[in-house]
């Protein structure tokens, strides 16, 4: 089992290669985000990711940078 919502077998991330969710710097996050959009746990995963600023990789269809921008906007 890896990070993400992988503890739930219905999570798309539980059924795929963990490397997809943690692309190296400069690699595209597009494929991971596309998979997230099909996941039944998208909303729960995104909410978790927005609450925890220490998470890295793609969570809930958002990159770490996108989540930082959202959190920054919410606190303004």
Curated annotation (Swiss-Prot):
> How does gene deletion manifest?
Dispensible for viral growth in M.smegmatis strain ATCC 700084 / mc(2)155.
Post-translational modification (record): The iron-sulfur cluster is sensitive to air and oxidizing agents; degradation is complete in 3 hours upon exposure to air.
Q: What is its cofactor?
A: [4Fe-4S] cluster
Q: How is the cofactor bound?
A: Binds 1 [4Fe-4S] cluster per subunit. Contains 1 [2Fe-2S] cluster after reconstitution of overexpressed protein from E.coli. Following nitrosylation of the [4Fe-4S] cluster binds 1 [4Fe-8(NO)] cluster per subunit.
Q: What would be an example GO MF term here?
A: protein-disulfide reductase [NAD(P)H] activity
Q: Where in the cell is it found?
A: Host cytoplasm
Q: Please provide, in alphabetical order, the Gene Ontology terms of the cellular component aspect for this entry.
A: host cell cytoplasm
Q: Which UniProt keywords apply?
A: 4Fe-4S, Disulfide bond, DNA-binding, Host cytoplasm, Iron, Iron-sulfur, Metal-binding, Transcription, Transcription regulation
Any one GO biological process:
regulation of DNA-templated transcription
According to the record, mutating residue 55 to Q results in: Small orange colonies in M.smegmatis. Decreased DNA-binding
Induction remarks? Expressed in the early phase of the viral replicative cycle.
What residues does [4Fe-4S] cluster bind to? Answer: 13, 36, 39, 45
4Fe-4S Wbl-type domain location: 12-69
Task: Kindly give the Pfam families that the UniProt entry links to this protein.
Answer: Whib (PF02467)
Q: Which HAMAP family match?
A: WhiB (MF_01479)
Q: Which PANTHER family match?
A: TRANSCRIPTIONAL REGULATOR WHIB, TRANSCRIPTIONAL REGULATOR WHID-RELATED
Protein task: A dominant-negative regulator of endogenous whiB2 expression. Low level expression in liquid culture in M.smegmatis leads to elongated and highly branched cells, with multiple nucleoids, similar to the effects seen in deletion experiments for whiB2 in M.smegmatis, as well as loss of acid-fastness. High level expression is lethal. Represses expression of endogenous whiB2. The apo-form binds to the whiB2 promoter found in M.tuberculosis. M.smegmatis cells expressing this protein will not grow on plates.
Question: What does the annotation say about its assembly with partners?
Answer: Forms homodimers in the absence of a reducing agent.
| UniProt protein name | Probable transcriptional regulator WhiBTM4
- Provenance organism: Mycobacterium phage TM4 (Mycobacteriophage TM4)
